[in-house]
Amino acid sequence: PPLPAHRELIAAADLQQPLSDGRQLLAHQRAGVRWLLARRGAVLADEMGLGKTLTALAAARALLRCSATRLLVVAPVGLHDHWRREALALQLSPELLSWARLPQEPPDGGCVLVVDEAHFAQNSQAKRTQALLRLARHPRIRAVWLLTGTPLKNGRPVQLLPLLMAIGHPLARD
């Protein structure tokens, strides 16, 4: 099914409301939430330390409020505690997946897929990249948001192709 209208998603994001721990989203994070909510597939490539995790979670929360979806987060195991803490501030309970154990398909029902350290999928021949692409293309995935501070880890444009494929970008079709 189609995603709710952008205006409805922005209202559900409640961007001015403090988080449960008292923090507020910063202006660039609020802009990032609006940007993600306008896209079914996106690469959020803010620099390290700007709060990509919180931005993606706030956008996912809006989507979860407006549609019957679940939140799947792919992240290195070492970052799972960070994801849990940030999710708690938004009263979310994402299903955390490791890069080493991606499922063949998402759980039943619609899902938002957030992928942290997405540059791990820059080698189109790697098994983890293939597993991510299979998961991202599944019909139950309603949105795919990739997070990385280094979209071109080694400066080779060909490394962007798997990321573009995962989000369904038109450049990846050719």
Task: Annotate each predicted stretch with a short phrase.
Residues 39-44, 69, 142-143:
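Pre-Walker A (Motif I) flank of P-loop NTPase domains
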Residues 116-117:
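Walker B catalytic acidic pair
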Residues 39-59:
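Walker A/P-loop
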Residues 51, 120-124, 153-155:
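Catalytic P-loop NTPase motifs of RecA-like helicase/translocase cores
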Residues 1-42, 89-93, 100, 111-112:
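Charged, low-complexity
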Residues 53-58, 67-88, 152-159:
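Conserved Walker A/P-loop ATP-binding site and its immediately adjacent core
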